[in-house]
Amino acid sequence: TRIDDDLQTSLRLLVARATQLPLEKLQQVCATYRELHFSRGVITLALAAARASDAADIALAFRADGCPEEVSHSRTVYQQRRAMYALVLDTLGALDAQLDTASNALVGTKDAAAHTRAADAEKERRDAYALATQSDDPLFHEELYTWLLAHGRTGQLLELHTPFLEEFLQGVPVLLNGESYATYVRGLRDLLWQLHVRRGDFFAAAQTLDELAHADAFALKLSERIEYLALAVGNAKSVRPSAQVHAQEVIGFATQLDEDLEVAQVQAKILGALQPLDTLDWDEEEKA
């Protein structure tokens, strides 16, 4: 249509001048695009503007340094890029809500129009996420993954096929969604081994679980350590030797895991036997 052609033309012209587009103007344009249901325009323009605003990748270097807290030009550039990414995330969130509304409207109805609206909403959302995840901007991917986790969309996160996801799950986070560092990192590693399982890399899953079981930073209960080790054993036994993982390496690793699991289980039995004795000693003192 004429409107679609005009929107595409405006997008092309704005992307070409993205370096000259201040944040406030970008926000205004994206708001207009959203009103016109031009999600592709919001995503394309906001991501282009974020990269154009920081051609030297100052924000990327700032993130690599762990986002130092002191006020600096680098922090300002980083925060500006985050504000631009937020326009994309707001659009994705609106499409999620639109699909939820359309899907809920299907309950108890066979109305053809309602089914068409739901199908259209699903397609618009799917296309938007596909476009966003095609970005080669690592900072945006970190924002997207963190946002998905904050909204409890772990299943959706693990379904993504991007070259940045594994690195994010095994990396050092700076955006913690209000959680403690140890709690957030443990959550990432839990998702990492699940990602490996989804991809059929059982050896990597077993290694991640083994690292979780032996990580002092997480202050695991013995029962949690046993659970991680049991999962590691199960994954190790699912590994098929290959050019990347030799049979001897798999056998040695699985044996070590079995031994660690057995030791942990013995510790649990001993603790279980000692607890009634502690209670008994306490009762005897009370009687005395």
Labelled PLM ranges:
Residues 1-288:
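Extended alpha-helical assembly domains of large eukaryotic scaffold proteins
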